[in-house]
A protein has these predicted regions:
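Metal-dependent DNA phosphodiester-chemistry modules and their immediately adjacent helices/loops
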Residues: 171-212
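RNase H-like, metal-dependent nuclease domains and their acidic two-metal-ion catalytic environment used
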Residues: 1-188
Length: 212
């Protein structure tokens, strides 16, 4: 089983916390062993990555952050626009203990754009992801904030679902919100000050572009 074979494992599971949230906003990735040592989740436990989607009624839906590739640095900094984050949120808060297989999970993925500066040129790569569900949407969004801070990545949520936009603004991270990329040309011509963050997954071409 390659998933459980440490010799073939190139990813690292752990958790992301944001220190001094709303002020200096410093993100930290904490590997699994360190999470257990520091008792991040209590009772010396660790929440494993959610591999089963859709999940079962008895599955642990807390989840963890899986990092496939660490942020690529140039002169000690992550280049702007090298990465972007996409978020698929849920619509209603529910305590984690009450989540069943009837409820959606939260998903956040960091992608590296095709580029010519990294060891993986001319390809789009998934570099980090989280799947799970915490007690509140805000708690889930804070995990995404940590991803965006670590990878210097703008966040593209599904507009009209969840609280991602309002939570990023609440914690002074508006600069990490991505304007609707499907409206880029229209925005330049008609309303350059339009702040439509994220993508609305609608119907027809709009749905296709949003999913793409």
């Amino acid at each position: 089983d390659l998933i459980n074979d440490n010799a073939t494992r190139f990813f690292q599971d752990g958790w992301i916390v944001v220190n001094d949230l709303g002020n200096s906003n410093r993100a930290e990735f904490i590997p699994k062993a360190e999470c257990i040592k520091r008792d991040i989740f209590g009772k010396g436990r660790f929440h494993e990555f959610v591999n089963q989607v859709p999940h079962g009624s008895r599955d642990d839906t807390h989840g963890c952050v899986r990092m496939y590739y660490r942020p690529f640095l140039v002169n000690g900094e992550v280049p702007k626009d090298l990465y972007f984050t996409v978020v698929d949120a849920y619509k209603v808060d529910k305590a984690q203990k009450d989540v069943t297989d009837k409820h959606s999970l939260y998903s956040a993925q960091v992608w590296m754009r095709s580029n010519t500066i990294t060891p993986y040129p001319n390809q789009k790569l998934l570099v980090c992801e989280y799947i799970g569900r915490l007690d509140t949407m805000e708690q889930n969004d804070i995990v995404t904030m940590g991803m965006c801070l670590m990878y210097n990545a703008e966040c593209c949520p599904e507009a009209g679902t969840g609280e991602t936009v309002s939570n990023f603004i609440k914690y002074k991270l508006r600069r990490y919100l991505m304007l609707d990329p499907t409206n880029a040309n229209t925005r330049k011509l008609t309303n350059p000050n339009n702040n439509d963050y994220g993508i609305v997954i609608g119907d027809g071409d709009k749905k296709y572009n949003g999913l793409r």
